[in-house]
Regions:
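Beta-strand/loop-dominated core regions that host nucleotide or nucleotide-derived cofactor-binding catalytic loops
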Residues: 2-127
Length: 127
């Protein structure tokens, strides 16, 4: 599923290996195993785990939830900063299938933004 995340201020729990940071799901959904990218399309890393405020492991985060997200790849302060926003990086083959599903209007908007971003480099992405 498409998703939009915000890295919360003062919510850095570990800097790297994996980086564990507090994030709010601004729209859509986020799952373990998904890759995330900056709003300009720069790849960041892969989500390894999601935890709620009560330290409970979850498989999925939905819009409005605040989670501790373990991301393999980036170093806080070098690759990502507090206040950064991210998209879930969807593979082109999944974008085709997602269009056929019953997405919420916000999820459709996020998918459209991700599609536009990828089509700058590949005109046929997700078709």
């Amino acid at each position: 599923y498409p998703g939009h995340l915000l890295y919360l201020e003062d919510h850095t729990f570990r800097n790297k290996g994996p980086a564990i940071v507090g994030m709010r799901v601004l729209g859509g959904r986020v799952h373990i195993g998904q890759k995330i990218m900056k709003l300009d399309g720069t790849p960041i890393g892969q989500i390894k785990s999601l935890r709620t405020r009560g330290s409970e492991d979850v498989k999925e985060g939905r819009q409005g939830e605040e989670l501790a997200v373990a991301v393999m790849g980036p170093t806080v302060g070098r690759h990502i900063e507090e206040g950064d926003e991210f998209w879930v990086d969807i593979p082109a083959s999944h974008a085709k299938r997602l269009r056929k599903l019953d997405l919420t209007p916000i999820e459709e908007e996020i998918l459209e933004q991700i599609t536009l971003l990828h089509r700058k480099n590949d005109h046929f992405w997700g078709r």
